[in-house]
Design a protein with these regions (language model features):
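Beta-propeller domain segments
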Residues: 3-45, 127-289
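Conserved blade-ending motifs and adjacent loop-strand segments that build the rim/top face
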Residues: 285-307
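Aromatic- and glycine-enriched pocket-lining scaffold segments that form the walls
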Residues: 106-128, 137, 142
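Asp-box/WD-like beta-propeller blade repeats and closely related beta-sheet repeat scaffolds
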Residues: 39-46, 66-115
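Conserved beta-propeller blade signature
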Residues: 54-58, 120-124, 175-179, 263-267, ...
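Blade-level signature of beta-propeller repeat domains, shared across WD40, Kelch, NHL, RCC1
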Residues: 302-326
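Residue-level detector of Asp-centered blade-edge/turn motifs that repeat once per structural unit
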Residues: 50-53, 115-118, 170-173, 257-262, ...
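Short coil/turn segments at the loop-to-beta-strand junctions that recur within blades
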Residues: 90-95, 161-164, 208, 296-300
Length: 326
């Protein structure tokens, strides 16, 4: 079934949203042995972007045996046959069994795509739980990259990210809003300036308002906190403070702008909610305000705002929901 909700007012004037939706049946059972090539679920599509006749797909790639990164494909859009070529990849990868931090999670991989213009795409990559790489300028992990479509060259525009899952480009003011999963708490909304002349560093895994899983009192975390202290200040350690952080974690996902200037919405997985907020880029202080939390009742994996409608991709029921603003 398909159900539409039409709001006669702005969303923060409502108390809740009760959604029905279009539901999709699973067509394959990936626990079947014949799908063992999925490597325990580490293979995954992260994002799809279609712009001006081109399609971009990001995914987790096994670069060599048991060693992974997040890569990007592109193709001309064709409804009969699509031939993809590699727009971005790297020989650098994180080995799921043999790495410095002795941890691995390919779901912590970013993969958000923003088409900036005819020459540039922006691309986020998580740290795969290889924390030290987020603070290495020579590594692709824990970064937001600017990639040239013509020659495949790239440069790092920001670093110190854990799992940058959401990106929104404000074309008028030329900045990005980035939504990032924290560890145990500490989900962030960050502002990345695209006219900045140096790499912007957001602090992971030196500073974070979250904690390592299990917290400081867990014996197994002693060495982890020595290497990655998760200071409760970014600016005191030379990093950029988040615009907003969430404790406890909301399981932050995509972030987008709405039709009215300075109005945005960020989605959540764990909290099953939308957070509508106002942000004034031109103000230095008191520039951020959450004006409404709207309960949806499901994990919201992604969303698109188009033609005064908000389309939600709901994970629990593999469904689409549409919210109209009139």
């Amino acid at each position: 079934m398909h159900y539409k909700i039409t709001y006669p007012c702005m969303p923060w004037e409502l108390d809740y949203a009760l959604l029905s939706f279009t539901q999709f049946k699973k067509s394959r059972h990936f626990d079947d042995p014949k799908y063992s090539w999925l490597k325990g679920g580490w293979y995954s599509i992260k994002d799809v972007e279609i712009f001006d006749g081109d399609i971009y797909v990001s995914y987790t790639k096994e670069v060599k045996e048991n060693c992974w990164n997040t890569s990007l494909l592109s193709a001309k859009m064709n409804y009969v046959y699509i031939h993809f070529t590699t727009l971005f990849t790297s020989e650098e990868c994180v080995n799921e069994y043999d790495n410095i931090d002795d941890e691995y999670n390919a779901h912590q991989s970013g993969g958000r795509i923003i088409n900036l213009n005819n020459e540039i795409v922006l691309f986020s990559i998580g740290d795969f739980r290889s924390r030290y790489q987020a603070q290495s300028e020579s590594s692709i992990f824990g970064k937001v990259l600017k990639i040239n479509k013509k020659n495949n060259d790239y440069e790092v525009i920001s670093m110190g990210h854990r799992n940058p899952q959401g990106l929104f480009y404000n074309e008028d003011k030329n900045f990005l809003l980035e939504a990032e999963h924290g560890p145990q708490g500490g989900d962030e909304i960050n502002v990345i300036k695209l006219d900045y002349n140096s790499i912007q560093n957001f602090g992971w895994a030196i500073s974070s308002y979250g904690e390592h899983y299990g917290g400081k009192n867990a014996p197994e975390n002693k060495n982890k906190y020595e290497k990655y202290p998760l200071h409760k200040s970014h600016s005191e350690h030379g990093f950029i403070e988040p615009l907003k952080y969430f404790n406890p974690s909301i399981g932050i996902s995509q972030i987008i702008g709405l039709a009215n200037e300075n109005q945005y919405v960020v989605a959540s997985l764990k909290a099953h909610s939308l957070y509508f907020f106002e942000y004034n880029y031109n103000k230095k202080e008191n520039n951020f305000n959450i004006v409404k939390k709207l309960d949806i009742g499901e994990r919201i994996r992604d969303m698109i705002y188009y033609n005064n409608k908000l389309y939600l991709y709901l994970e629990d029921t593999a469904s689409l929901a549409e919210i109209s603003f009139n």
